[in-house]
Amino acid sequence: MEGQPLPEIRMGYARALLDAQRYAEALQQLQVITQQRPEFAEAWLVQGTLLAQDNQLAPAEAALKRYVELAQKQPQEEHSRGLAQAFLALSQIAEKRKDYAMANAWLDRIDNAGDLMAAQNRRASILAQQGKLDEARKLIRSLPERNPAEARAKLTAEVNLLREARQYKPAFELLGAALAKSPNDTDLMYDQAMLAEKMGNLPEMERLLRQVIAARPDFHHAYNALGYSLAERGQRLPEARQLIQKALEFAPGDPFISDSLAWVEFRMGNKAEAARILEEAYKKRPDAEIAAHLGEVLWSLGQADRAKVVWREGLLLNNDNETLQETLKRLKVKP
C-alpha cells in the first residue's frame, strides 16, 4: 500500500518495541502487518507467542495455527525453529486448558533436534499437572547431560516443576546442592532467594539477595526483589524505594520494576503517585500482577468501578495469579 512501511520494516520496529518491553505497541504493529500482508508468516508467530504470554488463548491459538499453515508451505529449513516454537506454544495453550492429550500431540510434532529437550520439559510439566510429580522428575533426570548447558537446563526444569507444585523446600534443597558445587553462581543464588521467600524464610531471602548484589552490582532483578519484598511487608520503606530506583537505573522503563516502585509509593501513602505509575506500567504491559496492584490503589482512592474493570481484565489475563486472588479475597471483592 502506497505510503505504508514495508512489512519487513514494520517487523523490525515491532521487534525493537518488544526489546523495549513495549508489548502493547508491538502487538499493534504485528496486527497491522498480518492485516496488510496475511501471508507474512513471521508476524503470525510473534503475534501468537505474545498473545499466549498474555493468556489470550483463543486469538493466540488462531495466530499460531495460521503461522504453522504458512510455514509448512515454505522450505523446511527456513522455519524449523519457528515451527518448533509454535508447536511448544500451542502445547502450552492446550496445557492451560487442561487438554493434556492435545498438549502432547503438539509436542509430538517437534522434530528439530535443538528443541527436543524443551519438548521433554513440557511433557514433564504435563505429567506434574496430572499429579504425577515423581514421574515428571524421573523424565527430567533421564534427559542427556552432555555439557554444562544441558546440566543447567535439567536443573532449572526440575526446580520449576517443584516450584509449580509448591514443593518449595525440595526445590530450595536442590538449588542448595547445586550451589555447593558452584558457590559463586549468582543466578542460582537469586533463584534460591525467591524460594526462600515462598517458604517464608525472609531473613534467608535477604541474605541471599544481598550476596547477589555484592557479587553482581548491576543485577537489577535482585534490587527489585528485595525492594518489593520490603514494600510488601511495609518495612524500611525509604530503603525499599532506594533499592527499586537502583533497579530502574539498570532497567529504565521496565513495567514490573515500575510496579514495585508504585507499591512502595502506595505503602508510603502516596496513592495518587502510585496510581500514575501503575496506569503507565499497565498500559505498557497488561499483566495480572500489575492489575492487582492498580485495582487496589484505585479502590483505596474511591474509584471502585474503575478498580473492578481493571481486576476483571487481570482475571482474564491470568485467573490463577496469586497476588490478584489474594487481593480480591482480602478486600472481599467480586469484580
PLM region spans:
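Register position in tetratricopeptide repeats
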Residues: 19, 53-54, 89-92, 96, ...
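TPR alpha-solenoid repeat register
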Residues: 9, 43, 77, 86, ...
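Canonical positions in the second alpha-helix
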Residues: 32-33, 66-67, 109-110, 142-143, ...
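Residue-level recognition of tetratricopeptide repeat
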Residues: 6, 15, 40, 49, 74, 83, 92, 125, ...
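Structural marker of alpha-solenoid helical repeat scaffolds
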Residues: 2-4, 36, 70-74, 112-113, ...
